[in-house]
Amino acid sequence: PLAADTSKEWIPYDKRKYPVLFTGSYMNSATFLHNAKQCAGIDQPFFEQMVQKLLDRPMLTQSRAVWECIRDRKADLTKQEQKEIENNLPSMLHTQYFFDMYIRCILREEMLIQLLKSGIDVDVYGHNWELFIEYAKLVVPDGGKIHYHGEVFYDRLPEIYADSQIVLNILPWFKDGMHDRIPMGMNNGCVTVSDSCDYLEENLQDGENILF
């Protein structure tokens, strides 16, 4: 797991500035999908099959999903087409980055949209969130608000987390580790709300030191 720092200043929980915080970058999921489909080496049917499989079964690893997709497709392919898939496997595995990033784009949007629909404001630090604000105004015109504070260097995060009550996290698509937003929140007295993975379920207790 990644380490995280503790702020030099400890702020009492009920005095903290940010009720709900998310830190990270933003890219519109539709834009990312369009760009990914323009990349050389992207097998579009495979890409769409992989994304759907991972969204349907979030605890599935990417490598396992790749093999399941290949197995599923082989049943309907000729021997020549099966051979082509096997030959293209290295490039197909290389594109796992795109699956991970695209799904994170989707989940970040969905998480924040649902909070806004519930009337919950969210404070955000990171890159590109002005684009999400425009999107959110169209989708949730009368809900909660995004308060965008711009980009900051990583070494400022401990003091920002120490001034936050609840920290949100969306994991990258690995199952045997965690993102540093989680220990950063814990080290600075935040309630950390995250999706789950094998590592977190083995090492943390839902409702005790994290909320899934």
Locations of regions flagged by a protein language model:
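Catalytic core of nucleotide-activated saccharide and alditol-phosphate transferases
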Residues: 1-83
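A Trp-anchored, charged/polar loop motif used as the substrate-binding/catalytic surface
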Residues: 3-11, 105-107, 149-155
